[in-house]
């Protein structure tokens, strides 16, 4: 027993001598520390974001190792590299995939939703005092939110102008606003059908019927305009959809008089436009959604114009960060009675099902 205590005393004395015999001495010591930054991803995965090493030095170049001394044991600490290895072995490290706009946004409660000024691109809006309304199915919801945007229907919208593109570049195609312009009408009044019915009235009726069809299939529905008028310009409507919905569908009828059929407004095949954000990150999703809608309409007996696509530089597309389409469901002379609108709603809903793989 005495021999054991004697050996321990000698060992402790040796440790103190190695450390300089004085805790206040810094001339012959080197402090080494390591920190591993670990955070949780949105999917709940543990992600190692970095290893930080710091060495605070002594005046000498002698490398020393800190040791912990207890009454009965002496333990040598590992080096920085060994510590890092141990952390890596003990921690499950998994790279997360970059977030895409196809992912569902955070679910919001049903009710009115206005434009949040902190949202991306919200500052470009000029008319934004109105509210959209979010509806949810009573049961069997699928968690997907579709923004149904009844085109037009904003009093005073044609008296205001907004920037065509977030980066200030001019339009590349002509429509309501000509190519080369840098500002566009905030919300146009729309056309009038051959029977005297305003387009805004028909788009709202279409939106209400589509809402019911989508709710019956388990979708949440964000009614961008839930009445005859909403004080939200095209940018405000788009930004609200960006932050609440999984996809954005604007309902329109064209101003021609040939009853030419349905088509979607495709993203212009112009390099400068397709390389501009947020178009660059989303135009393929816009096109895929447009094609799905046309296929759904066609399979339900709706007449399709040409190949179902017409290129157009739209404010909606220029500011959209979710799959987004302006769908033209006919023109001034097209049937817009209740039965026809129901048929159109089924075709659109089938296209939405197809796009989301349902």
Spans of features found by a protein language model:
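Catalytic-site microenvironment of enzymes
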Residues: 2-14, 18-358
